[in-house]
Structure formats: C-alpha cells, structure tokens
Amino acid sequence: MASDEDDKQAKHLPTSSLLDVLTPPTGYIVDRALCSAYSGQCAVLVAMLAAMVRQGTAEGKGSSDLALARALERLKDRVHFLVQHGRLIGPRSASPILNMLDRFVVPVKYDERKASWHPKVCVVRCVNRYSVKAKPIWLLWIGSRNFTKDESWDMALSLTGEVDGKGDELADVNSITRRLAQQAGVEAQWLSALQELGTVRWQVPAGLRIDKLVLFTHGDLKRDLEPVPANARSVLAVSPFLDEWSVSNLVRLLPPATDPTKKPRLISTVACLSEMAKKHRLALARYNMRSLPESSQDDQPEEIDEPANEGADAGADAAESRGLHAKFVWIETPKRGELRLGSTNLTRRGWKENAEVLATVSVALPGGSYSEQMRSGLKAFDDFCSEYELGEEEAPPDDELRLQREFDDARNALVVDFVATQALQDSVAVVTLRSPLHLPVGACLRIGRIGDALMPWDAGVTSLKLPDAPAHDNGDLLRMELVIGDLSSEWLQHAPFVPSLSRDTRDVPLLHAYLGIDGVISLLNDSLTAGGNGGGRRRPWNKPHTTGTSVQNIALLGIEAVLSSWVRDKESLSETKRIVELARKCEATSEKEEKAIQQLKAFLTSWDAIEQELVKP
C-alpha cells in the first residue's frame, strides 16, 4: 500500500523516464548516441539499448531477447556508454550475451584516488528511416542519475532539437558532444554530425533561457563554484554530498541573514548532514537545513549489486544516497531565477577535480506558465523534505573509519593497477597482467567471465587460464571481486582481447547460442515485418535459451515479405541482411531442431535467388 508520502510525491512531482528521452520519435531511428555516467548496471544498459530501437518500456521492464538482439546488431558502432572504469556492475549469474556490451562500453580510466569520471549526459542523433528529406532530430539530456536501477530524487534538463528547425541556437552542445566523442575515441566518426550540430535549433520552453552548458574534465583550469550573487533573495541548494569548502563558498557573497526564515536552504541526506556537523557546524549554521526520508525502494531486492560505499568525498561518487541523487542550486534575484543543475555534488572534488557536466538556466520572473510550474514544483519538493536540526553527534570509532579508508584505497588502486589483456591460446582464454599485483595483507581477489564462477588471483601471479568455454562466451569485461575482512566490492574490469574478438568468431555464434534457431527465425520475421513484430515466441532478455527442447513451428514469412523488405527502407534492408548472415551460421543442436533448420535453409535459398535477381546490373 502506498504511504501518504508516496501519494504526496506522486501528486506534486510527476516523474519522466530517461528511457523515454532515449526513445526516438515515431518513424525515426537512432543514428548515433553518446551516453555518459559515473556508474552503470548491465541490466539498465540493456534497457537503454532496447529503448533506442523502440523496444523498451519506461520502467525498463519487459525487454525481450529479440529486442536485445536487434539492439545489439543495429546499434553496434553507433552507441557508446562512457562509464568510470571499475564502476560497471554485472550480475553474478548472467547470460554470456552481456559480453556483447563490450562493443558499447567505453571505460574512462580516471584514477579515483584523485578524481572520477562523473558527468551524466546523453546526446542522441535520430534520422527518419523512411524519408531522406526529413531533417534529423537531436535529443539532449543532462542530469544527476547514473545508469542504475536506483529510483531516488533526480533533476534533469531534457531538450529536443531539429536541423534547420525553429528554436534556440545552443553552441555549447557542440562542445559537450565533441569532448564526449574525443573521450570515447570516436571523434572521426562524429565529424559530420558535429558540423550538423551548428544548424540545430533547440526547443526551449517559453520563459527559460539556456545560459551555459559545459562539460568539465580533470585538469581544466577555468572551473570553479560560482557563489550566489549578493542580491539573491532566495536560495535552495540540493546535494546528497557536501563539504565545508563548497558549503562556505556558495554563500560567501551573501550577508548573514538576521531573520532565520531568510537563510539559504540546504537539502541533503541525514547521514551527510550529520557527518558534516561533526567538524563544520559553523558552515552549516548559515543555512536552514532539510533532509529527505529514506527511499521506499530501499527494501526492494536488486538483481545487480550496487557499488559499495567509498567513504567521505570519494563516496560522493560511489555511494550516492538512494533517497537523493538530485544536484542543483535554485537562486531567485529581484528580476530572475537561475537554476544550476547537473552531475556535480557540493564538494571541492566535484567542482575542482572530477569530470562533471553543468547546465545553467535563467528563468524570467514572474514569467509564464512554465516558470511558475517549475517554481511550484521546487516548492513542493522543498515542502516534501523534513527539517533537520543540528544535534550532538558522537564520532564513529576510529578503527571503523580507518578500515573503510584502507579498503577504498585498495580497491581504487586495484582498478588502476590491474592492467591486463586476454588472448586465446589453444582455444583457452588466458588473462595476462602487465606487472604483478601487490595486494594488501589478507586481501582476496577473484576474477572470472560474466556469468562464470570466480577464480582466485594470488598476489605475484601475472597470468591465469580461465575455465574451458566456447570461444564466443568470452568478452573484454571481466568480473572482479575484492574482499578484505568484512568489506567487499564487485565490478567489471576492462581487459581487452589481443587480437580483438571478431564479429564472425564471437558475436555471430554468441547471438545464435543466445537466441536458438527458433529465436533466429523469429528475429528474421520481425525484420521482415514493417511493424517489427512478425510473431513467434519471445522470452525475457535475461532468461536462458534452453537447447534440445521442442522447437515451435514458426512459419517464416513468404516471398512477398522478402520483396517488401527490399523496397521498404535502407535501414530495414541492412538489418535484415545482417540477420540473414546470422541465420547462415545456424546449425541444429538436436534432432528436434532439424525441421527448423530445413525451413531456414529453404528460406535462405529463396532469399539468395531474389537477391541475385534484384541486384543484377
């Protein structure tokens, strides 16, 4: 049963899904996308890919094996997820199909002992699949949430733009996109799109003005926390993590308020405010403090583990409270409002060291209906929070803090030091380190493939053979688990194959093993059908295909559908051709699949005959 607080939240602040933002408009397909976050879960990346081929749901549930297969085939080399190295989480028991995420994930190798890759931003280009004359549409999302299942409070800026359309010119989008493309190593593939961005006009709601969009990276010198102007009459600062430097600098130009009700408002979590109060009570005393209740989702089991807490300021990256992810500052002056939102916590690490994204939006006051709606929503959010009073706090035991810091340092050092490659030697995958590891006393490190049992990796060892498995079960992402005493952390570590695993030797047989013959036939039917649903069975994407069981009789569509696919649109034809090549690799794994194989071979014979006729010079 929903609580009164749940009802209040639903009434005042309806939510929108990141997956909705990533879903292309009807008639359009995703041509390319750059998506960045600090951390991610494999299941959420699957949901994002499914949304990009219009096969997902707002909740990320219900994605089928066919939806995932279509997304993996269609979006490879087009979509890239930039995630802090060591912060992608994989399920402990999973289908090897998740190995194909290595075609999409770009691990950004920041040393977290110094700084983190932390921007939350998506840039998506969509093209009309039916008309080359239709103008491309661009989607931009700048927010505070990671690519995880967490359902905490968030705030984001979402804009739609069109080439040569009506709206505002936002040159900063080009700068952000270029930096993302450079970080992903795909700037050359994005050159024409970057040039096109200069002609895009963005639909900004009336009463709002986008003043600045910027992506900071580690080492940038011209970046700082801009203080609130001295004439601000109202300030609302929201961040799940705080430090004294940011809290003090934000209001350093404001005269101290004599009326307690006129103080700037600061919203954070109880845990963060309590920790800050131990050493920085004077800095907090400048504010009226408020906190959020625990999220109602905290008791829900997660399919994939969340990252472990990482301590004080580094923990601002790793353990962001499930109750609060939103990071923004709302400032009202006599003539206008200013909203600063993005990925940056109110910490010096966030504003000076991390890679972060920031959007600054001006709002006309009193303004039109949209600005009034936004002010009303912010007030409802503020009212939803609870008052926080400074109390006497006892410092936690020093030993507990020391052990946590030592574990955090060991984990972050391990992610940096575990520089490894993989290779197939006599069909066996061998992981080889560049140099031996030096693990802390009592530390236990285990590694393995996605979905495999983990194997111990001892200090001083420089190579390890993984258990025998089909070649297509391998991937560039290895599961890692570090245990020191009662503390543990698990993540996916990037260890690329040299030479790289090819589409023919890894992707095609992996897709075949994942789908089975009946799945390949269903996928073919889907690609031959204009609506993308050619019948046949579907199963949840994370449920395994069972070999050797009875195969459904799924009639492949006839010659009319084949001919239609050749004239429908270029993208549909390219997709069908890729699936046809996948179908050519299929082999029966049981007598029960022989009938399906014969059916498939008959279809391929017809396809070849039609192709030969249609491509005659």
Which functions belong to the PLM regions below?
Residues 1-338, 347-617:
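Terminal interaction modules at protein C-ends
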Residues 343:
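Active-site glycine-centered loops adjacent to acidic/histidine catalytic or metal-binding residues
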